[in-house]
């Protein structure tokens, strides 16, 4: 997976198409990601007297990683990501549109 926690991504398909958000959690075994403010679902929660009250709560549900693209911080557009090795041997991600390094992988 080319997406990591705290990356800014944009949804490219589905009901939340066009929304941007920060990656809260990456689930590599399921090939899914949880994004802040995207794919909001309602869950019915029973009250636990010592911990929390019950009711209907809203939270983010995971979506497939293939439905999101990383937003390049340099050109501010959704882009595909490539991998490259620097001269010192460090593996980094780079933007396929502008060629700039996104961050170290």
Curated annotation (Swiss-Prot):
| A GO CC term assigned to this protein in UniProt | ribonucleoprotein complex
Q: Does the keyword Ribosomal protein apply?
A: yes
Q: Which UniProt keywords apply?
A: Ribonucleoprotein, Ribosomal protein, RNA-binding, rRNA-binding
NCBIfam families linked: rplX_bact (TIGR01079)
In the record, the note on similarity to other proteins reads:
Belongs to the universal ribosomal protein uL24 family.
Query: What does the subunit section of this Swiss-Prot or TrEMBL entry state?
Result: Part of the 50S ribosomal subunit.
InterPro entries with a match to the protein in the record:
KOW, Rib_uL2_dom2, Ribosomal_uL24, Ribosomal_uL24_CS, Ribosomal_uL24_KOW, Translation_prot_SH3-like_sf
Q: Does the keyword Metal-binding apply?
A: no
Q: One GO biological process from the UniProt record?
A: translation
Its function, per the record, reads: One of two assembly initiator proteins, it binds directly to the 5'-end of the 23S rRNA, where it nucleates assembly of the 50S subunit. One of the proteins that surrounds the polypeptide exit tunnel on the outside of the subunit.
GO MF terms held by the record: rRNA binding; structural constituent of ribosome
Name the domain of life: Bacteria
What start-end ranges are recorded for coiled-coil regions in this protein?
none
Q: What is this protein called?
A: Large ribosomal subunit protein uL24
